[in-house]
Amino acid sequence: MAEPVQEELSALAAIFCGPHEWEVLSRSETDGTVFRIHTKAEGFMDADIPLESVFHLPVNYPSCLPGISINSEQLTRAQCVTVKEKLLEQAESLLSEPMVHELVLWIQQNLRHILNQPETGSGYEKCTFSTSTTVDDGLWITLLHLDHMRAKTKYVKTVEKWASDLRLTGRLMFMGKIILILLQGDRNNLKEYLILQKTSKVDVDSSGKKCKEKMISVLFETKVQTEHKRFLAFEVKEYSALDELQKEFETAGLKKLFSEFVLALVK
């Protein structure tokens, strides 16, 4: 980890030193650092709104944008997504310098103005899928592999909700013991999905206690190519045979992806 980033993390830990204000969720030489900050910001009618901000600092941060996830019991998911998008816009002006504290201060000062903007809304009306099949320069595709799902019904509903809230399309695919999640959408939203997947208590352990997902791997990530199918919705599908799963990938223009990454899971 670069020294400026270490210094920034130490400073953040000193600033957010109150009970439960600061928590490091993971550190990795390859994936960077993920941490959570709990703060409050002024919302409607001057009322304080509690905010949970999860930041992912990749190894090449601050030369690249951090991953950001925003949650609040007093905001809708659509509002949280809008707040996150505004933060990322602000982050672009701070590239190449430590920015997390600046971003936290900015959202504390500007949350009320963001929520008052008509396009922010007060419900989930923005969380809809585009039916366009034209090439979108901002469209990316990610393939994830899960080791298992113990609380399958709850887990599936959670994945469906995240995909809907973040306007992601694709497939949650089951074949025997193989579990794959194929996601298409805005790259920043894909990053936020991964943060949610890794930091939320989405499953249960062997004793039935709620736990975070620790056995997920990113098999593939790339910008959507011309030959790739545009998924119009997020669907959960089960396959009884490998050739059925293969056909799904081939229909989506992902034959090479299947051969390189999925077949290896079967062997």
Swiss-Prot record:
UniProt-listed InterPro entries: RWD_dom, RWDD3, UBQ-conjugating_enzyme/RWD
Function field: Enhancer of SUMO conjugation. Via its interaction with UBE2I/UBC9, increases SUMO conjugation to proteins by promoting the: binding of E1 and E2 enzymes, thioester linkage between SUMO and UBE2I/UBC9 and transfer of SUMO to specific target proteins which include HIF1A, PIAS, NFKBIA, NR3C1 and TOP1. Positively regulates the NF-kappa-B signaling pathway by enhancing the sumoylation of NF-kappa-B inhibitor alpha (NFKBIA), promoting its stabilization which consequently leads to an increased inhibition of NF-kappa-B transcriptional activity.
Domain of life of the source: Eukaryota
Pfam assignment, any one: RWD
Subcellular location: Nucleus; Cytoplasm
RWD domain: residues covered: 7-114
One GO term describing the cellular component: cytoplasm
PANTHER family per the UniProt record, alphabetical: RWD DOMAIN-CONTAINING PROTEIN 3
Lineage: Eukaryota, Metazoa, Chordata, Craniata, Vertebrata
Annotated protein name in UniProt: RWD domain-containing protein 3
Species in which this protein is naturally found: Pongo abelii (Sumatran orangutan)
Domain writeup: The RWD domain is required for the sumoylation enhancement activity.
Subunit structure: Interacts with UBE2I/UBC9, NFKBIA, HIF1A and NCOA2.
